[in-house]
């Protein structure tokens, strides 16, 4: 597919690209797939569950609702692949009764286990008279260091945690409406806020740390006992907070980025802000992993190494829901690699002889 050229409009992050300059699925993967006569793309469809046979060991298709008409449809299938967002994959498995739901008290079950997020810290820097042109960030520019992440020579023991954080400085957006960095102490509204917004839009920079999150028995996904979606199904409930390991790691990364920030000699510097507790209100990360993890033991994992369900041989589950824990790095690259890995196993091994591949 031929991509367009970036227009440096400032709306790259979190938006579709009107110039078709980003490698988004709707201008790359989907148009290529639609060239094949055996591909049928159905929009405005919400899958509600995986259909099973009487044994509960074989998927027979999926049920979905046309959200425009409300029509409920059952689509038969010999092979089912869950390729929704990771959280949605877990939700569908729970709704469909596939695999045993995880119980944090007894530590039995596998579906909903090992939910993980990302830790980290950040600090804002303001440089009077310097222009960083955030609106031409093209989705992400800058640099990062791995000294406190995957560097085996970094002694973590004296800081009291395992894992680590990579540290980066740069920009990922310049959205003219929502990107409005102002120094600490600026009024949240009024003429002073407007002046600060205009003055510092071009001249603000952030240093951030993105840290690992280790699995914890009490960080889980399950079906909510109270709240339901528009189709009357239980919503998925996320139970999560940063534990002692992440708090120590985030405090340490805040110290490091503070040192880096002061060495850059900004006009104004905010306070380094470690993530010590999870909160849905301020943006922290969007990288969710776990809940339907892969492994070598059906008693402790939901999927085998080919992302095939241990319980239902003709069901494969893509996405970061397969990750047993979360790295400081974003999961996008490995998600794509695992999808290729699983697709190859499906085509070269499963379709030739449908069975458990492990």
Predicted features along the sequence, with ranges:
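Non-transmembrane alpha-helical segments in soluble domains
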Residues: 30, 93-94, 254-261, 343, ...
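Conserved redox-cofactor binding core of oxidoreductases
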Residues: 1-47, 279-284
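A glycine-rich dinucleotide-binding beta-alpha-beta segment and adjacent secondary-structure elements
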Residues: 8, 48-53, 202-213, 218, ...
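Active-site-adjacent "gating/activation" loops or surface patches in catalytic cores
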Residues: 38, 43, 55-60, 77, ...
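Short, hydrophobic/aromatic-rich segments at coil-to-beta transitions
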Residues: 57-63, 203-206
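FAD cofactor-binding and catalytic pocket of flavoenzymes
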Residues: 108-236, 242-247, 285-290, 310, ...
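Glycine-rich loop(s) and the adjacent beta-strand/alpha-helix scaffold that form part
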Residues: 23, 36, 45, 49-53, ...
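Secondary-structure capping and boundary motifs in well-ordered enzyme cores
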Residues: 73, 84-85, 107, 249, ...
